[in-house]
Design a protein with these regions (language model features):
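Post-DEXD/H (motif II) to motif III coupling segment of the RecA-like Helicase ATP-binding lobe
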Residues: 175-242
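Conserved RecA-like ASCE ATPase "motif II neighborhood" in helicase/translocase motors
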Residues: 139-169, 176-184
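Conserved pre-motif I regulatory segment
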Residues: 19-64
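Conserved Walker A/P-loop ATP-binding site and its immediately adjacent core
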Residues: 69-77, 82-109
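N-terminal accessory nucleic-acid engagement/regulatory domains that precede
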Residues: 1-29
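Loop/turn-to-beta-strand initiation segments
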Residues: 88-89, 135-139, 164-167, 194-199
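Inter-Walker segment of RecA-like/P-loop motor cores
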Residues: 112-152
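A short beta-strand-to-loop transition that corresponds to the Sensor-1 phosphate-sensing loop
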Residues: 96, 142-146, 201-205
Length: 242
């Protein structure tokens, strides 16, 4: 009835008035910014997306990003995405121990932030001896000189590993056209011919800026397929970095 409605209106009006008059009440936070623990800049995210898209049609790609643009971080984000979608083996090759350790540590940070399961990461350079014959899901970071030596001593072990590896990453990709390194890369990619990808990382387009023959060899080795750094609003991405 009318009296009941009036009493209800009065009751709730009094409640609202009393709750709004509490000047000591602390404001309630309704939103917050959540920072990514392994975030990327826009140009790095674009490069990762480009790699994913281009690998659907190509088996070899060269990622060319100038020094200071986050080449390793970009490659690790791509690698984390790649491993998140499949159980497989990835081999990361570098020509010195410093680059190997950098890659190993960086992958650990990337996978802890972006990974979706527990997997294995193994060292194989210097004094490290990896048990990669049992590796079926994870990353092997290897010094290419040691890797090449193992091929000569125990080629069967390398064959078994190569058959399980679906992605080979070569840091400092301009080294890839050296005869020793090239033979290792060719062997690993041939062993898993049905599902094998090769990614080279480079801060410079070739061994030198003016050696056309070396640039041509590098381009041909990666099937003339290259992903480069692009930054909106800059014709030359180096200008963005300086």
């Amino acid at each position: 009835n009318t009296r009941t409605r009036k009493n209800l209106v009065r009751f709730f009006s009094d409640e609202l008035a009393s709750s709004g008059s509490n000047s000591d009440a602390k404001p309630v936070e309704s939103m917050e910014s959540i920072r990514a623990s392994y975030g990327l800049f826009q140009h790095q995210m674009k490069a990762v997306n480009d790699l994913e898209n281009r690998f659907t049609e190509n088996s070899r790609l060269l990622l060319h990003m100038p020094t200071g643009s986050g080449k390793t971080r970009t490659a690790m984000s791509f690698l984390a995405r790649y491993l998140s979608k499949r159980q497989t083996v990835v081999i990361w090759l570098a020509h010195n121990e410093e680059l190997c350790e950098q890659a190993y540590s960086e992958f650990s940070r990337a996978w802890q932030a972006q990974g979706n399961r527990t997997l294995t990461s193994q060292r194989y350079w210097g004094q490290h001896e990896a048990h990669y014959t049992s590796l079926s899901d994870g990353l092997l970071v290897a010094g290419i000189q040691k890797f090449f030596g193992r091929i000569r001593d125990d080629s069967q072990a390398i064959y078994q590993l190569g058959e399980r590896a679906s992605l080979i990453i070569m840091d400092e990709a301009h080294q890839a056209i050296a005869p020793t390194y090239q033979s290792v890369l060719e062997l690993l990619t041939i062993l898993n011919s049905k599902d094998s990808r090769l990614l080279g990382l480079s801060a410079t387009p070739g061994r030198t800026w003016n050696n056309f023959d070396e640039d041509r060899k590098l381009s041909e080795f990666f099937d003339r397929q290259k992903v480069t750094l692009t930054v909106d609003g800059y014709d030359n991405p180096v200008d963005y970095l300086t």
